Design a protein with these regions (language model features):
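N-terminal loops that bind phosphate or other acidic moieties
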Residues: 1-65, 69-148
């Protein structure tokens, strides 16, 4: 049985991340759940929605991914996983989610480790070497002067 993945994030990030994952991994739609937290949402209401979304997975294999540690979605997620077997990781990004989807069949501990590594490895500096970014001959400033 696969672990399930619940994304709790500021709207519309959770749904957007899930949509991206479904674009690539459509077969896992039942295992990935998104909960968008609206700006005016009350934490108690969001927690109730999260409990409903998590269902029985809370004790049978749930990885919760949230966006910003200390923000409302993460605080709700912390309350959700407290006293359960679920794992929680803050700082969700697309590489983390893709890694989670690919390894959702592993143990929850292994899945959480892979998710965290995937998120961190997905962040890297990228050099700009495309031709349009290289220095080349410039036009004389007068080239752009036009009579009005």
């Amino acid at each position: 049985m696969n672990n399930r993945i619940l994304i709790i994030a500021h709207a519309p990030l959770a749904s957007a991340l899930r949509d991206c994952a479904m674009h690539v991994y459509a077969e896992c739609s039942a295992d990935v759940i998104a909960l968008d937290v609206l700006p005016n949402a009350q934490p108690e209401d969001t927690l109730a929605q999260a409990l409903d979304a998590a269902g029985a997975s809370l004790d049978s294999g749930l990885l919760v991914l949230t966006d910003i540690f200390g923000a409302t979605p993460a605080n709700v997620a912390q309350k959700l996983v407290a006293g359960s077997n679920a794992k929680l990781i803050a700082g969700v990004n697309l590489p983390m989610l893709f890694r989670s989807v690919c390894y959702r069949h592993e143990t929850l501990e292994a899945l959480a480790a892979r998710a965290q590594a995937g998120g961190a490895q997905g962040i890297m500096p990228v050099g700009c070497t495309a031709p349009q970014n290289q220095s080349g001959p410039r036009h004389a400033p007068s080239y752009h002067d036009h009579q009005q």
